[in-house]
């Protein structure tokens, strides 16, 4: 566990990245190397764990170590490639904390950060897929993320180049969240968009049921007696 003094120092150094003072540049570079060393150690630990569930549990215990560094980067908002931030964002998504990962995802997309070499896909694609898969998994367990949060991710990634199948899954998750909160028209729109992007996204029957409900609700009450 890091000491309060070290956490404070890491937060200040990260926030000062890109400052004109060469001394701060060197201090920040040294601190970044320490973060990378810590990350490499944690990755070695994770590599020795076979269970996906246990890996996720391990990531939850590791993530707080990086909080001061990440807080400093987000506060400075200066951009620049940072493999620590990108990895921590992906680990946070892995743990299912979509809300906790959003500010990091926003930073990564706005500043055009790349994924480390060990990842074969772009940051935008990885974010979209993690959010969609996690959202759908939580929805099927009856504890899905909020419609507003998923819409925020969808908007963040709107102009990014992402595989159609991945974006389709994200629209599927957003549609289900909309439906869960009573926004049927919006849900239908997202379902239709998901099918436009990938017709095997697995939402056809849900859309058919929803469209029947909407049609029924839009019809005048047949039992009504007029005025």
Where are these regions (language model features)?
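N-terminal alpha-helical interaction modules that lie
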Residues: 1-82, 106-161, 216, 220-227
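Residue signature of alpha-solenoid helical repeat architecture, marking inter-repeat boundaries
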Residues: 78-79, 122, 163-166, 198, ...
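Residue at a conserved register position within TPR or TPR-like alpha-solenoid repeats
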Residues: 91-92, 135, 171, 178, ...
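Structural register within alpha-helical repeat arrays
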Residues: 87-88, 92, 131, 167, ...
